[in-house]
Amino acid sequence: MQFFTLSSVDSESWLCDWKNGHDRALAHTQYEKYVIEEAIPFIKHKTGWFGQMMATGCSMGGYHSFNIFLQHPDVFGKVIALSGVYDARFFVGEYGNDELIYRNSPSDNIWNQNDGWFIDHYRNADIIVCTGLGPWEQDGLPSFYSLKKAFEEKNIPAWFDVWGDDVAHDWPWWRIQMPYFLDKLNL
């Protein structure tokens, strides 16, 4: 197993308070395009691996890994998302009918994803989404439970794992969770 870690552009996208919501989503979409059109081909060339990959991350990385998996399940056959917030409103507030923000708000758009191609890919993937209930995890809980409910209603097998009240939104826990879930995937 080999990991490639990519820097984010969150300070220019979702966390850029001086931009409006649409422009934040646009910056994120440009980043997604970079990942799919430049980083992934580079990784495939570098490794000689041309099969599906795994997306994974913690906190904002949890959001990114899950969102890019939902957008590109042909590229990513596995996802481990830890402690993410999966609702774009957390970053931009109410967004009305902005299609670009909606597309990048997993806890919203999954409910209307009925395309058989996507659903079949999701059903054949290894999907793990984990959260704790301890300090700093509360912001992500509503979107975590919304995703869980949507996946259940769409009969998409996924492991939505909730850890205890002592499990904080912090690196010491992610260092425990990541090896645990990798082991569960036999990786």
Describe every region a protein language model picked out.
Residues 1-187:
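Non-catalytic cap/lid and distal C-terminal segments of serine-dependent acyl enzymes
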